[in-house]
Amino acid sequence: MYLCHFSSTTLLKKLSGNRRSMAPSLHTLSLLFFFFFFFCFLRLSTAWRPLPRMKNNVTELEFGGYKKYEGSSEFVKLKYHMGPVLTSNITVHIIWYGAWPSAQKRIIREFINSISAAADHRSPSVSGWWKTVQLYTDQTGSNITRSVRLGQEKNDRLLSHGKTLTRLSIQSVIKSAVTAKTKPLPIHPKGGVYLLLTADDVYVEDFCKKCMCAYPFSVPDYIPGLKPLKSPNGEAAIDGMISVIAHEIAEVASNPLANAWYAGEDPSFPVEIADLCEGIYGTGGGGSYTGQMLNDEDGATYNMHGIRRRFLVQWVWNHVVNYCTGPNALD
């Protein structure tokens, strides 16, 4: 993945819902997080998803005594570096770049709305997943906010910056959205997150290189004998995107200025709370195994419920217990 900080966090990623997910000409989607809007420095890091085993799920008994240590390692040194976390309400504004079908938009909207949904809806839940993120505090002891809501949206159907976006032109797309003469997106200096999502015919610079895109809903041909999982909402690209959106909202909340919660000594290359659990979706996950997930009667794989839909979202690092946790944990 490629990341750019604007006195905060900016992220560009793309996902593919097709089996040959490394080919940028196929159906792809990108997202960009932009938090605040001032100066910028660029950094490059590689996102990865672990290669899977041939079995997607195993029984609880097979986990033995290791099921409570998903992702744990004596080498993980997540530290708090005294910077702020997002304790104010988070508002996610979306820029739809290109022609987006309404059905796909609805899936993404519901996921964002599910983060702060009432706790009494079906478990395991998206809001239950966010509780792990809320464990992180600033130096005053204030926790990350419970409130994450969908803000305003802007459609850029005419592709104002062309069908090919670079990291620099992506910055221009967001700047245009917040400075537009008609219906500009509002600027929230304490909790505004700007999410740029590109349609399937838009190419983004360096998309999906040196990584496995949209796994486990898409599997490259070089892994023989493994079929992609059925996505919970019938949209492999969008369902794969949901986990990346969740990943980055969790990290922008816990490390917005690259000086709060992360592992490693270099703040320009931080390993953040979702990076530590990349590819882990359930109990027993770690290494090359995704963990125990849920399968519905229609064959779809998921690990948490939203307001009305189901989603497959990676776990995040829990600094209290020092391993990855999620709402669908068997223990």
Which positions does each model-derived feature cover?
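Loop/turn elements at helix/coil->beta-strand transitions in domains of secreted/extracellular proteins
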Residues: 89-92, 189-194, 238
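N-terminal carbohydrate-binding/catalytic regions of secreted carbohydrate-active enzymes
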Residues: 49-174
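Solvent-exposed loop/turn segments at secondary-structure junctions
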Residues: 98-102, 200-204, 248-251, 259-261
